[in-house]
Structure formats: structure tokens, C-alpha cells
């Protein structure tokens, strides 16, 4: 059963800190424990890449089997060491970024495709530019179609295979 969600974050990145805050508020409502660890700063005060494998080991020791990688420029830049360290510790990475599944070792991505988000933005822009609407009059729109991508090589390594009905709607890739 899914009881713990891991998160590595960088408090010096606003997006990363916001995601930590959001998950801190959301996980108790879902009955899930959030195990969040900050990426250790190095001697320069910037996040230390070498701390990523150490933090993954800590997450494993705390019983984390699933890890969320959200918005973090630092972790995205170091996605290869991030995802491979997770897999080495038996932790599955879930992310909204398809490239982590396609080009690294994340297990699963559920994401709005960029072209769909661009289409929504264009529709909103047309309402403003062509139809003369004020931006404040427009409702907030959200993507309704999502891409499900799963890395089957990682699924095999972790022995975490998705249900068959999920595979019918997901795109399975091998890195």
C-alpha cells in the first residue's frame, strides 16, 4: 500500500519550496505521509549534487518507495543522478516532466503536453485580442487531456508493473 511519498527539495528555489508547501498541505488529506528532505548545501551555499545519492539512501531508510520530482531547476539539471540514485535505492520517481521518463530513470509521468497548454493559452489570448475581453473577465482554464508515460525498463528493475488497464492508456517507453 502507498503510505509515504518522498520529496527532495531546494529551499533556495521558489518553485521547489512552493511544491514542498503544497505537498505538506495535501498529503495529510490523502492519508499519506510526506517524507521531505532538503538537498544539502555545499561549501558555496548552493545545493550539492553529491548529496543527492545520500538523500536517496535516507529516503529508503525512512521507508519511501515513491518519490515526487516537481519543479526544481537544480534537480532537473541533475535528473540523471537523481533518477538513477532513486532506482538504485528501490524508489520509483513520479514527475510531471516526460523527459525524466524518456531520457532518465523516472518510472512515471502524468503531464499536460506543452502543445495542449499552448493551445489553451492561444485560446485565451484570442478572447482578449480578438474579442476585446478583459483578462480579469476570463475564467481560469486547465488542461483536461494528460499524457501518461511509463518507463518499462525502470518498472522491471523496481518490480513495479502498472495494472493492465493503465497500460492501455499509457505510452510505454524503454530508455
Model-inferred region functions:
Residues 1-175:
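Short hydrophobic alpha-helices and adjacent helix-cap/hinge residues
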